[in-house]
């Protein structure tokens, strides 16, 4: 039971009820699930009437940048377990002649296709 309670508690790196004090740098050792847990725990306490529109916007910007930082951190922690990234641009392969000069591997099919209408 204590393990469940400990698992639900997220490290407090920001207070969603105080947008001017949300800083992306404070999200350094957090996971995305920690951010969601903090937001869910404080959902009923949010009252932004005492803050200006600029303070709220800056707080949201910092929240999004901090959350993105947690996602990058999570990916880096699991780098050895992930599928290797593939090149976005096409290499020399059998269908190189059929692709436009840009050669985006996953964007352009080797031929033009048109759906057949039943009308």
From Swiss-Prot:
<dbReference type="InterPro" id="IPR007584">
    <property type="entry name" value="Herpes_UL35"/>
</dbReference>
<dbReference type="Pfam" id="PF04496">
    <property type="entry name" value="Herpes_UL35"/>
</dbReference>
<keyword id="KW-1048">Host nucleus</keyword>
<dbReference type="GO" id="GO:0042025">
    <property type="term" value="C:host cell nucleus"/>
</dbReference>
<keyword id="KW-0167">Capsid protein</keyword>
<comment type="subunit">
    <text>Interacts with the major capsid protein/MCP.</text>
</comment>
<protein>
    <recommendedName>
        <fullName>Small capsomere-interacting protein</fullName>
    </recommendedName>
</protein>
<comment type="similarity">
    <text>Belongs to the herpesviridae small capsomere-interacting protein family.</text>
</comment>
<dbReference type="GO" id="GO:0016032">
    <property type="term" value="P:viral process"/>
</dbReference>
<keyword id="KW-0946">Virion</keyword>
<comment type="function">
    <text>Participates in the assembly of the infectious particles by decorating the outer surface of the capsid shell and thus forming a layer between the capsid and the tegument. Complexes composed of the major capsid protein and small capsomere-interacting protein/SCP assemble together in the host cytoplasm and are translocated to the nucleus, where they accumulate and participate in capsid assembly.</text>
</comment>
<dbReference type="GO" id="GO:0019028">
    <property type="term" value="C:viral capsid"/>
</dbReference>
